[in-house]
Swiss-Prot record:
UniProt cross-references to SUPFAM superfamilies, sorted A to Z: P-loop containing nucleoside triphosphate hydrolases (SSF52540), Prokaryotic type KH domain (KH-domain type II) (SSF54814)
Region G1: start-end pairs: 29-36
Subunit structure of this chain's protein: Monomer.
Region span, G5: 168-170
Organism: Rippkaea orientalis (strain PCC 8801 / RF-1)
The keyword Membrane is annotated on this UniProt entry: yes
PROSITE patterns hit by this protein: G_ERA, KH_TYPE_2
InterPro entries cross-referenced by the UniProt entry: G_ERA_dom, GTP-bd, GTPase_Era-like, KH_dom-like_a/b, KH_dom_type_2, KH_sf_prok-type, P-loop_NTPase, Small_GTP-bd
GO MF annotations, alphabetized: GTP binding; GTPase activity; ribosomal small subunit binding; small ribosomal subunit rRNA binding
Segments for region (G3): 76-79
Annotated protein name in UniProt: GTPase Era
Amino acid sequence: MTEQINQLSLSSIPIAPEGFKSGFVGIIGRPNVGKSTLMNQLVGQKIAITSPVSQTTRNRLRGILTTEEAQIIFVDTPGIHKPHHQLGKILVQNAEAAINAVDIILVVVDSSIEAGGGDRYIVELLENTETPVILGLNKSDQQPQNYQPIDESYLVLAQAHNWPVIKFSALTGEGLDNLQKTLINLLEPGPYYYPPDLVTDQPERFIMGELIREQILQQTRQEIPHSVAIVIEKVEETPTLTRVFAAINVERDSQKGIIIGKKGAMLKAIGTAAREQMQKLITGEVYLQLFVKVEPQWRQSSLRLSEFGYQIET
């Protein structure tokens, strides 16, 4: 992998100059409002998978933006929603825990539609927080001509708490310079937490697994994406070749059949696309071999959830 996502080397963390600022920014919001796309844009590299399917993000991801004057660690959280299984409960608990573990909270909403019950629920969660909050109106590029009533539905929520409001498009990058400046202004003086050239603290295997899961999200539909867990079982590396062996875990035989596809066509397509994404991050050639396993009701099993890397984060 590139230097940015190699394991953290404490010796490469410099001493911050006088006046340098740093801190953690929690990105929260309903599912599918563009939180992961936003973080990818802010750090300048794809570290969080994106998909039109809601609840794409399952873990609290950290993305790191370092400028001459500040280091901002963005924490991308799972979308806050009403959970329907044990996995969902863990995701929501982790997202809510992030609210109490950051220096600034960035609430991201979809400004192509009016505020709804999910947005108001998040505002209620933040009712008594002492952490600075910014309301970010994302998807400004997708707003209809008569967008004023939509904006007003969110401005009412922000004005009740004196939250600053910033409008932007995570997809096009419009307005993100203003967002970055606002965040830096709110940060306190602080040290470098990570080397300046690092963009995420996630290990290589996690990134590999997420790239595979992203292709499943993009190439399958309905219940399949939420029933999938990826386990990187083995990685073999030489100077010119990285061999990755990964298991795709599903809950039912029918789901296994869909992922494999007719004569293995779907599995091949998933593997080819995921390998191409890995190739952008890894020096040398990449060989990716995928297996599909059935683990009945793994989303309801505390043991399986832990084995697959899903647990309450502190």
